A protein has these predicted regions:
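Short amphipathic alpha-helices and their capping/turn segments at secondary-structure boundaries
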Residues: 1, 89-91, 134
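Residues immediately flanking
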Residues: 8, 59, 149
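Structured beta-strand-rich core segments of catalytic domains in phosphoester-bond hydrolases
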Residues: 11-100, 107
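Catalytic lobes of large eukaryotic enzymes
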Residues: 34-39, 102-107, 111-407
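Acidic, serine/threonine- and proline-rich intrinsically disordered appendage/tail regions
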Residues: 401-429
Length: 429
């Protein structure tokens, strides 16, 4: 897997938690970084609006080829003044192709289907990016739209819906799914593709169970005894710009001279999770793209053997069109680093420069900044103008300092001291 995109809704947004999460990484981000960083992924970007959270994790190998990373959010709750509902997006250029991920939480309740569509259109209209070629969400080559879209199953009664689910006859419910119904009428929705709903409706469940809602609906002052009708509220759709008309019914795009296409490999829910009244949904996609460039903007390497006994050198070179800045810097990272600010130390490319030629520039890092314990590390060049990593070195070893090595050896000797051997009954003499 090359990339993980995670959209959460209804994350704890109490004011104390929210303010704390603004200053520090929220618990969900920390959890996912703890899982993914040992596997060679870093958090490329994230955006949060109250209870909506969107995270993108990417394999190291792709980082130098991802550019123009921007985030956006749109509030639609309380007439646009409150962010309990709305959409958050992360867009980027991946090997030269513009891709956008949009996580939405749309209005609830079966009678609000039109409001859901209105809010989605509002999000599409209001989110503008500072890019002449790709200013709007629908201008991106690929758009993934997902989240708690809150569309319900219309017309059918709760008993028919539950009976159809019990018999795994989900197809009986598809034509009355409000999103499917809207796609038949709304032209802009017809450009979006979704895999078949071959899993149970993902809402509403009793907590910590796979049993559909057994409690009455809570109104302003009391429970009215009416139970929620199951629905596919949690969805993943995608749109390929100007290619939707070439899509086959199973979601694959027709072959030809296309430089980019999307294939859905699976689309499933996960019934074992019970911390919410929704069941999470995942989609696994194959993204076939023809790279518009294959050379990183910056190539950098550590010079010689690195240890904490001496200053160390970094050599780097850039392509001619690279928009360098005096605010660019090179970070030293452990190979399991979590995000771009998770560096051990860094050097300013201008202030710490010691030599420069037409082809190669060298900067130094003081010996005092080098980790004494050593280990496996890598270097990343961060571009201020691009607000992203423009180059990454191969992993390399930093040798432990003599002091660190002696300390480790002494500890091993202490751990190696054993009690005198007591012969076992059958030891031979």
């Amino acid at each position: 897997m090359d990339m993980y995109v995670i959209g959460l809704q209804e994350v704890n947004s109490k004011i104390i938690n929210f303010l704390s999460d603004l200053a520090f990484d929220d618990p969900w981000s920390i959890f996912f970084m703890t899982v993914f960083s040992p596997l060679g992924y870093i958090k490329l970007s994230s955006v949060r609006m109250q209870g909506l959270l969107l995270l993108v994790f990417v394999k190291h190998a792709h980082i130098p080829f991802i550019r123009d990373i921007h985030t956006h959010y749109t509030r639609t709750g309380l007439y646009g003044y409150w962010g309990n509902k709305g959409g958050v997006t992360i867009r980027m250029s991946l090997y030269g192709h513009m891709i956008c991920f949009m996580n939405c939480h749309l209005p609830a309740h079966i009678e609000n289907a039109e409001q859901r569509l209105d809010d989605f259109e509002k999000i599409l209209e209001m989110q503008q990016f500072e890019d002449e070629n790709v200013p709007n969400i629908l201008d991106h080559d690929i758009l993934f739209w997902f989240g708690d879209l809150n569309f319900r199953i219309a017309d059918y009664g709760i008993h028919f819906v539950r009976e159809s689910i019990s018999n795994s006859r989900y197809n009986l419910l598809w034509e009355k799914d409000q999103l499917n119904m809207a796609k038949k009428k709304e032209a802009f929705l017809q450009e979006f593709i979704e895999g078949p709903l071959q899993f149970k409706p993902t809402y509403k469940f009793d907590l910590h169970s796979d049993v559909y809602d057994t409690r009455g609906q809570k109104t302003l002052f009391w429970f009215n005894g009416k139970k929620r009708k199951p629905a596919w509220t949690d969805r993943i759709l995608w749109r390929v710009k100007n290619l939707s008309q070439h899509s086959s019914e199973d979601g694959d795009l027709s072959e030809g001279e296309q430089t980019i296409s999307v294939t859905l490999n699976n689309y499933i829910s996960h019934m074992s999770y019970g911390i919410s009244d929704h069941k999470p949904v995942t989609g696994t996609f194959g993204l076939q793209i023809k790279p518009l460039f294959s050379t990183p903007l910056v190539t950098l390497n550590p010079e010689g053997e690195w240890n904490a006994a001496q200053d160390v050198l970094i050599s780097y070179s850039t392509v001619s069109e690279f928009p360098s800045s005096t605010w660019d810097w090179i970070g030293l990272y452990q190979v399991t680093f979590r995000h771009v600010n998770d560096y051990v130390t860094y050097a300013w490319v201008k202030d710490d420069e010691i030599s420069s030629s037409e082809d190669v520039t060298q900067v130094y890092i003081s010996a005092d900044e080098i980790p004494h314990a050593g280990g496996e590390f890598l270097l990343c060049y961060y571009s201020h103008n691009m607000q992203s990593i423009a180059g990454m070195s191969q992993p390399f070893q930093i040798q432990p300092s003599r002091r660190s090595a002696e300390k480790e050896l002494a500890q091993e000797n202490i751990n190696g001291i054993e009690k005198p051997h007591s012969p076992k009954p059958y030891d031979e003499f």
